[in-house]
């Protein structure tokens, strides 16, 4: 996918999110990628998934994110997603991330595809972490993923 696609996708997500935004709920986070731990450890995956991205929280339950990271099969992945986390327990949010990503040759030859994964988030005043589970599927070896983030606004 082209850069233009990702710019349009992120702008569309932000505009849609702003329409349902709650007052005083806006937060901007920068993430630096993270780590993965694959269920099948015999395949020599890269589990240090450094990257850069942004996440904009528009309500206690909803945020939009976009970024890029070095994935488990040593390719660059670009993504854009909406995180819907309706279950809150203090600073812990639980729900799902829904979005588009690329960079995995076994899925649509490395092109863009839809992805959904369960997502648990902890957000403190300045530091946060997203925890996800990628399930085992036909062409996907599952993993636990951890993404670290820092609040900038």
Language-model segments: residues:
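Outer-membrane beta-barrel "beta-signal"
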Residues: 30, 34-38, 141-153
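Transmembrane beta-strand segments that form the barrel wall of outer-membrane beta-barrel proteins
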Residues: 30-38, 62-71, 93-106, 120, ...
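Residues on the lipid-exposed face of transmembrane beta-strands in outer-membrane beta-barrel proteins
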Residues: 32, 52-56, 80-84, 118-122, ...
């Amino acid at each position: 996918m082209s850069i233009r696609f990702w710019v349009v996708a992120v702008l569309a997500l932000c505009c849609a999110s702003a329409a349902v935004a709650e007052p005083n709920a806006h937060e901007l986070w920068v993430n630096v990628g993270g780590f993965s731990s694959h269920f099948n450890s015999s395949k020599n995956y890269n589990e240090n998934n450094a990257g850069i991205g942004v996440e904009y929280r528009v309500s206690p339950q909803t945020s939009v994110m976009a970024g890029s990271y070095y994935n488990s099969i040593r390719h660059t992945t670009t993504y854009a997603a909406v995180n819907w986390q309706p279950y809150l327990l203090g600073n812990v949010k639980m729900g799902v991330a829904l979005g588009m990503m690329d960079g995995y040759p076994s899925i649509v030859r490395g092109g863009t595809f839809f992805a959904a994964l369960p997502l648990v988030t902890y957000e403190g005043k300045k530091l946060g972490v997203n925890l996800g589970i990628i399930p085992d599927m036909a062409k996907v070896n599952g993993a636990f993923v951890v993404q670290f983030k820092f609040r900038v606004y």
